[in-house]
């Protein structure tokens, strides 16, 4: 985006352009995760973090009365390492797993493709828009 004048750009729009611009966005161009990427996230180092999150989620679900329908949304699932471990952990709690609808909010088509490959045969749903204020 080239301009000859100074433009006030709100931070959220700057971040959105930097990360998700269709031509040059950071998460659009490549997979930045893992040993070949720019950084490694906790689920890629050890299962422990994701397993602890899973235990907390199941505990929370029980504390609110074990509802028959429960949505769990992961925002920006990266290479799906956490969701993969969450699913494995949730399967150890069949009543919870039966009630849980797993959703990934992902804007990047590149990462969504990686996630779908990693979570093949998993009952996960994807969304790319939560709401709009316009």
Report the location of each language-model feature.
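Rossmann-like AdoMet
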Residues: 1-75, 79-129
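Conserved small/polar residues in nucleotide/adenosyl-binding loops
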Residues: 131-134
């Amino acid at each position: 985006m080239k301009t000859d004048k100074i433009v006030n750009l709100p931070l959220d729009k700057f971040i959105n352009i930097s990360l998700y611009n269709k031509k040059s966005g950071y998460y659009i161009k490549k997979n930045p995760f893992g040993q070949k990427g720019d950084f490694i996230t906790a689920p890629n180092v050890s299962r422990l973090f994701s397993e602890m999150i899973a235990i907390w989620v199941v505990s929370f679900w029980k504390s609110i009365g074990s509802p028959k329908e429960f949505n769990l949304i992961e925002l920006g699932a990266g290479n799906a390492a956490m969701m993969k471990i969450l699913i494995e952990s949730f399967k150890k709690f069949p009543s919870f797993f039966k009630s849980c609808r797993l959703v990934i909010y992902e804007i990047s088509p590149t990462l969504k493709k990686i996630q779908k490959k990693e979570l093949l045969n998993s009952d996960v749903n994807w969304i790319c828009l939560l709401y709009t204020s316009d």
